[in-house]
Each structure stands twice: as C-alpha cells, then as structure tokens.
Curated annotation (Swiss-Prot):
Location of region: G5: 335-337
InterPro entries, per database record: EF-G-like_DII (IPR053905), IF2_II (IPR044145), IF2_N (IPR006847), P-loop_NTPase (IPR027417), Small_GTP-bd (IPR005225), T_Tr_GTP-bd_dom (IPR000795), TF_IF2_bacterial-like (IPR000178), TIF_IF2 (IPR015760)
CDD domains membership: IF2_eIF5B, IF2_mtIF2_II, mtIF2_IVc
Pfam families for this protein: EF-G_D2 (PF22042), GTP_EFTU (PF00009), IF-2 (PF11987), IF2_N (PF04760)
Protein's cellular compartments: Cytoplasm
Protein's name in the database: Translation initiation factor IF-2
Region (G2): 224-228
HAMAP family: IF_2_B (MF_00100_B)
Phylogenetic classification of the source organism: Bacteria, Bacillati, Bacillota, Bacilli, Bacillales
Function, in words: One of the essential components for the initiation of protein synthesis. Protects formylmethionyl-tRNA from spontaneous hydrolysis and promotes its binding to the 30S ribosomal subunits. Also involved in the hydrolysis of GTP during the formation of the 70S ribosomal complex.
Family (UniProt): Belongs to the TRAFAC class translation factor GTPase superfamily. Classic translation factor GTPase family. IF-2 subfamily.
Residue ranges, annotated region (G1): 199-206
Gene3D superfamilies named in the record: 1.10.10.2480, P-loop containing nucleotide triphosphate hydrolases, Translation factors, Translation initiation factor IF- 2, domain 3
Amino acid sequence: MSKIRVHEYAKKNNISSKDLMTKLKEMNIEVSNHMTMLEDEVVNKLDNQYSAGAEKPSVADEFEVEEKVVRSKKNSNKNKKKGKANEDKRQDNFAGRQQTPIVETPDKITFSGSLTVGDLAKKLSKEPSEIIKKLFMLGIMATINQDLDKDTIELIATDYGIEVEEEVVVSETEFETFIDEQDDEENLKERPAVVTIMGHVDHGKTTLLDSIRNSKVTAGEAGGITQHIGAYQVDVNDKKITFLDTPGHAVFTTMRARGAQVTDITILVVAADDGVMPQTVEAISHAKAAGVPIIVAVNKMDKPAANPDRVMQELTEYELVPEAWGGDTIFVPISAIQGEGIDNLLEMILLVSEVEEYKANPNRYAAGTVIEAQLDKGKGTIATLLVQNGTLRVGDPIVVGTSFGRVRAMVSDIGRRVKVAGPSTPVEITGLNEVPQAGDRFMAFADEKKARQIGESRAQEALVAQRGEKSKFSLEDLFQQIQEGDVKEINLIVKADVQGSVEAMAASLRKIDVEGVKVKIIHTGVGAITESDIILASASNAIVIGFNVRPDVNAKRTAELEKVDVRLHRIIYKVIEEIESAMQGMLDPEFEEKVIGQAEVRQTFKVTKVGTIAGCYVIDGKITRDSGVRIIRDGVVVFEGKLDTLKRFKDDVKEVAQNYECGITIERYNDLKEGDIIEAYVMEEVKR
C-alpha cells in the first residue's frame, strides 16, 4: 500500500482533516499538519476505527445542509408578506436553485502575499459568510474585504482539508533571477559554443585569435570589414563557434563578479618552450571556478626548444591529465604563427560542444550579457551584447543593467548591419540612454513603456544602494573590527607627488597580509588629494593615504563630513609600518597632528637681512605663532618647518583668524611664491 497524506485520507473517508487529526492524537499518533504522510500501519489502524460502511458527513456537507435550511426559512418568512404571484415565482426560483449542482471543494489553492475574505471564499468555493463565521469562531472579527495573512489563510484552508501553496512573485525589475531559467526541452535548439582564450603573457593568445579569425572567416564575408566589437564568430564544418576577443581573465573576473556566466569552453594556451607560468595557474583557477571544460592548446610547436611532454607533466599537478595518459583533458599541439593544428583545435571545440549539448530557445525575447560598452561622439552609447537566449531584433525595447532604450541598429562582428541575432551571437547595438558596464545582464521586452519603467526602477534602486549608509572605519578601530570578523579586506586610496612613489607604495602595501586580512588598493593617482578622492573613499569605505601631498580645502571639509580617515606621510616605510601596526592592534600614537588653518600667499616682499616676507590672507581656521607649517604648491608639499614671524601690520601677534591679512616669514625658507598655501598645524596628545 502506498503512503497517503492526512488530508487525502480525510477526503477519501468523507471526514474533516481537523477531526482526523484529533482522532490521531487520541490514538497517540503525532502529526504536524494536514500534509503529514501516514504510514501503512497507521492507515490500517484508522481503517479499523472508521468502518467502511459508517460514513460520516463532512463539516462542509453539514454546513451546506444547515445553510439551505436557513435560506429556506428566510424565504418562507418573506413570502408571508407577498401575494400569490410572488409565491409562485419564489417556488419556481427555489426549484431552480435546488437543481443547481454543488461546486466541489478544490484539493489545492494558491495565493500571493495575502487574500481578502471574499477572494479566499471564492478560491475555496464557499460562501463569504461561511468564512466569516469560521474566523469569528477563531476570535477574528473580519469583513468581506478584509485582508487575511498567510497563517490565517492556511488555518482556514486546513480546516477544509485543502492544501495551500504561496506563490513567490519575482519583480520584473530583478529579471536576473529568472533570466537563466531553463525552457521546456521541446523548445530548445542547438546553439554555438562561446569560447574564451586564456593563458600567460606572450604565450600566443592574441596570435591564436588572429590565426583563427584569418583562416576561418566565411568566404562570403571576405568583403566585410572586420571590426573589434569584443567577440566574433567563425564557421567550422557548417557549424558556428563564438570567440570572446577580450582579455580572458577580465571575462571571468568582472563578469562573474556581476553574476554573468558567458563562457562555455576555455582554451588554455601554454607555450611548449616555456611551460606553466604564474598566469597559466591563475587562468586554470578562473576556469575551474566557473566550472567550464578546459582544452589545452600547446602553442609554439614550431620552435626548436618545444617540449610538449614537459607541459603535460606540469599540468597534471593541476588535475589537467591528457587523454593519452588516461585523463579527460584534451591537449592539442599547435603553432599559431604558422597556422598549424588550428583545424584540429576547432574540431575539438565542436566535439566538446557536441558532448555538452549547448542549447537555447530562439523563440522568445532575447536575454544575455554585455561584453563591452563605450560612448561614441557620433553614435552615442554603443554596447556589444552576447545574446544567450532568445532572439534580439532591431526595434526591440531593451533593459541593459540600469540603462534602457530601443535597439536602433545592430552590427555583426564583420561590420554588417543585421536585423536579428540568435543565441550565442555577438552584436553591437545603439539606442541605449547611458553606457552600461561589462558583465551587466540585458533583457528585451514587448513594450517600450514597460522597458523604460523597469530601467528607471533599476537605476533608482542602484542609486539608493550606492547612497546606503556604510560604517566607515579608521586605523584606530581597524584591529577591533578585524578581531570581530567584520573586515576581510582593507580598501586604500593612494596619492603621491610622483608616479614612482605611487607605484612603490602600492607594491609595498599589497604585500601586507596580517591575520588573513588583505590590502586592496582601489585607486592611485599623482597630485593633491581632491574632493573626488574623498567621495570615492566614502563610497568604498576606504582609507586615503597621502605621500608628500595634502588634501585641498574642499577635500578636507568633505573628509570631516563623511568621516573618511586621511593619513598623510613623507616616508614610505612609515606608511607601511602604520598600516601593519593598525592591523596587528599595536597602533598607539602618542600625538596626532591637527591642522588648524591655511593661509594663501597673495604677495611676496624681499627684505635684506630678513628674507622673503609673505603677505597672506587666512582662508581657513587660524594661524598661530607657535604652530608648525608646511608650504603647499599645486597640491604638493615643498617644505615643512616652523614660523619665524607672524605680524598684523607692524605688530607681532600670537594668532591671526580667518578672513584677516597677515605677514609671515618662514624659518630657513625664502622660496615663497604667490599662490602658495601655508598650512599651520599643531601636535595634540591623543587620549587612548
């Protein structure tokens, strides 16, 4: 005997699920709800309890009879006040009503979010008054238009022995969630494989791409102008293969970071005379993480030092064992520069495609991924799209990431205008309102108004997410956050006076690795720390490191407002030491520098035996006699020292406030120029 659910047994034996569950509890048999499966032994016990002949009327049937009696009484009372004609009419109507068949109660109902009492009654094939009575018995006062929550709906439905299922509605603005849903098998048709070529620098990736392109472009397309749109197709044995002509690693990192899976097969290019190199290992990791098949192309076989056996031996360490050695990885010896082995490689790609059975449904609205995008002065926004499912047509309304529009024109990889593009076809389109990012998903829609609405909603959601409050962190509380597990990566923005310093600092900072927390440099630049640097730091939750440069007035104000930690240094090893100390929890500075004001040099005077006097105007804060100063020229610190004199007219003063003029001389420094900024600072003790 097969297992049966509680509500199914109740229905079979014409009893309510509630009564059955009560009976089961009396028999010391635990059931959680009406969906619980009953074992054969339990069913046999129940059969003994409910003899086959003794059929109990269900609660629903009892209520139906009661309802008819009530209705009949009401009608008879009304008819006492009416004439004979009305009585005959009533009898006719009553007779007609008696002939109306009873609507069967459904086995299952579905709902989304909530239902009103009226809607629930309709779904359960019951009168609203009946549902209201049941709710009243449960202590819930409800009207016909009142919304019921999920628990109440399930409670009422369970009482009738009806299964309830809640539908989860996915907003069309989040089309990524259903863009990859599989279509019915009968609608799927074979599509070309999408191939990415990866490998170490100078192992021949670009040469291989060029060799394939030059040898396999269809003869009929020879007159077409080959243009770089980020992807192209070739014909092999009457079948097409799509190659992504973009940096291989970028395809995996940037696109996979946005949830896009575009590659079907990876070609790993390894030079026969060089073997496995660091980027080769990185490429293997990317391909394995993406879960795509790997075909190894052993390139440069024309060189005298070529040693394919060595390559195979080295790759076995990374679980890429050749078929000849009992593994399942395809190895193809080639010479990209001479065009040898290219045909064999392409045949292997077709073989893998055949085994993997790449399919898509061309008879639906298109969906896919952005490969490249740019802004052209003449054409506007241009985006290269890879159609992964469906068919894209000129004129289709489309949403791409947070941008939207209508496909105005489509250009193929050979520069020809096309009207349709099927699965695995790369095309360049125009017509979007803004430039999307590589890896953004796209979807075509039937209605332009709907596409615009979805695009605007997505853009608004992205803006809200970007503006969302983030907990800023500084070096002082960094160790605590690391200990609590809140920080796995430290974002830094590095600015310096010259490019060499930027590169040296970035290289040194990237090597820091304390307690599994790594340093990530999100931006570098030469020159003063600007307001845009602070805004980027705020959005990325980053710390700004300045080497021999200073923030301008706006940057400083924004940093205070956004609570961004800005660290300024003049010695590289001090920067590294400070970051490492902060990560290890040993950062304990006794003093902290506090900038108290800035003055702009408006005019200079050279005086014998005194030196250069700077006529200044205090633009921010105040300048004090005992403060340290630094001279900033075009955002770069050119000198750091002490004030020699501070005067107002001819009098020595202790301080000069904002919006006042003053005369300043700097100890042991006379090369002051108009436009220089004199920044005053003091060292304050930090309370720990």
